[in-house]
């Protein structure tokens, strides 16, 4: 749920010049990340938007989507310690990328 802490940890554990390849729910048209839900101190979940669940091969019920990222994710990655961030999109059935374009964030420490 704390994606900024996760980004800092990615940057911390990567070697200098290490590279992070990240996929995450992303809204092309959104300049800012949409926070859909928050984890409370008591472990409960506060829903700020109607719950959305994404596919999970382990749990048939899916995984709760806590946020859908906007373009500000690039700034958050830089703030976390990445010096270069780029975004690419792909659609390639032969590699299993179906449906809408898959977005990849590539961040170098």
Regions found by a protein language model. Give the residues of each.
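S-adenosyl-L-methionine-dependent methyltransferase catalytic module, highlighting the catalytic core
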Residues: 2-109
